[in-house]
Amino acid sequence: MTDYGVRCDVRNVRLYHMHLEGPAPFAKPENAKHFRSISFFIGGNVRQAVQAGTADCIPIFLHEIPRVFNEGHVKPDISLIHVSPPDEHGFCSLGTSVDCVRSAASQSKYIVALVNKHMPRTFGDAIIHVSHLDFAVEHHVPLPVHDVKKPSKEEQQIGKYIAENLVTDGATMQMGIGSIPDAVLSLLGNHKDLGIHSEMFSDGVVDLVHKGCVTNNRKTMHKGRIVGSFCVGSQKLYDFMHNNPFIEMLMVDYVNNPKIVAKQPNMTAINSCIEVDITGQVCSDSIGPKMYSGFGGQLDFITGAALSDDGCGKPIIALQSVTSKGVSKIQPALKTGAGVVTNRAVVRYVVTEHGIASLFGKNLQQRAYELIQVAHPDHRETLEKSAFERLHVMPAP
C-alpha cells in the first residue's frame, strides 16, 4: 500500500488504526505528505512519528471506539481487513482481531480483505460473508508472533503476590499482554474454575485451559466460553484459537463495556502502567507530555471491576517499583504533562515486587503510606519527605 501510494503520488490519506504489528512504512517522515497515521492505541512502529507530529492519536476508551464509526465522527472510504479463507458456506473469519473492525467496515464505502490461510478461524462476531467483501487479495504469510519471555525475578514476585492474595477460585479474569500478566497466569496452576472475559488474552491462558484451571463454568454470562476481542501471542496461541468453539471473539463495545464487565463474577482486572503518584493517580499512556501508548481497555475493566455487581471485583494496577534506570515508578506527583488514565478514586490495589498497596477507602495520608511501603526501599525516604511537602503531614496507616 505504501509503495503504491508513493509511486502514484497519492496525497493526504488518513489511516485510522488500532495497534499494529510489524513495520509501518507509511509512518516514515518521508511519507508524511502521502499518509497520516491516526492511532487509537500507539504501538512502537508509529510512536516516533506521533511524538514528531507526523502522525497522531485519538485518546479514547477502547469500548467507545466503535462509536467513532457508528456515529459518523470518522467516515471511512475503505476498510482494510485481514481474514481467513472462506469456509464451504462462504464465511471468512476476522480471527485474532474483531475489536472495532465490524463497525468500521459497516460504515465504509468499500471493504478490501487480505485473505490469509494462516489466520485462525474464530467464532462469535468474527464471522463475515464473502458477499460483503468488495475486493479480496490472497496473501498467505504467518501472523506476527509475540513469544513468551521469561519473567524477571521482580515480575515473578509481583505475579506471586497477585496469584496468592488477589485471585480466588472461580474468578473471572482480564489481563493484558506482557511479562507481569504472564507471571500471574503461570502461578495459577492450583486454582479452580477460572473464567476469562478480557479484551485480549495470550499464551498463559492456553496452558491454564490444558491444566483444567480455566473452565469458565462459574461465569453467569457466556458460561463455558472464553470471551475476548483480539489476541497477540505465539503460534501456539493461534493454533489453540483455530476452529475452537471454546472461544468467542466479540465486539469490543460489548466485551469492554463496564456494565458488562461489572456482571462478571469475582471480576479480577490486572493492568499495568508507567507511573503512579502517592495519591493513587495512574499514568499509562504517556511519559510526561510524550504520548507512548493509549487508554486501551484499562479503565474499562478497572471501572467494571470496581463497580462489580457482586461486590467482589478486584481492580489491580501492577508494576515494577523502578524503571530499568532505577528511577522510582511511584512518584510524589506525576511528571509534568503526564496524562491520568485511571483516576485515584477507582484504583483499589497497586502491586509491586515489594507488596500490595490497598487503597480503597483510604485518605491521602494513608494512601501515601500504602504506596511508599511498596516502593523500592532506595526511594522510600525521599518519597516520605516529598509526601510531607505535598500533604503537610507524614504518611501513616
Task: Give the ranges of each region predicted by the language model.
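Conserved alpha/beta enzyme-core scaffold
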Residues: 1-397
